[in-house]
Amino acid sequence: MSPVTHFLTGWVFANCAKLKPRDRAIVTLASVAPDLDGLGIIPELLTRNSSHPLLWFSVYHHSLHTLAFALVTAGVAFVLATQRWKTGLLALLSFHLHLAEDLLGARGPDGYQWPIPYLKPFSSTLQLTRQGQWQWNAWPNIVITVVLLGITLWLAWRRGFSPIEMISAKLNRELVTALRRRFPRKEFLNSGSVGTSLDGRRILGTHRSSLCFPSAGALLLPARI
């Protein structure tokens, strides 16, 4: 699937747990990490008409879609995270969500499936493929991406943070403000009990919910709206 789809998948998945902004970003990026092996397409395209073309994409694509790199990604997540064990485990699961999505719909326009060499570099015996895998640009992938984008915007409206927080807290606040002005709710205007979340945002209600396990009255507002 598209890296955009993988990114949105990682973000939505990261919101299934109570994580600090840094850890949310780590879990989200873990869902995109396998596609680092796709960066070889840049030198391949730049050198395709030269006397010595670099076939880095053709040769190495999916070389990081492996259990070994999943463990490396989880290890890096563990080291960088503030909530280490939780973030490391979620990063490992987020990585595997990427593999699952590729099995669903990553077939090329020529009909070729990119097998996932899950056990490399230790073994080449297991090559993951799926009969009926749809093309990379097929309508199910588009629908999945649109649904994930909708959930991402809903999370921003509901909780007060979006993937934009990874690069700018100010831009994140502006997005949330715009969403809440466009789709107002009285809870955002008439606050109940006010507390402070671990990531510095104001919380309305007595308990912060997760996407997977929602609870009544859990609403996040940015510090300034």
Give the ranges of each region predicted by the language model.
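N-terminal membrane-targeting hydrophobic helices
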Residues: 1-195, 200
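Short, intrinsically disordered C-terminal tails of secreted or membrane-associated proteins
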Residues: 218-224
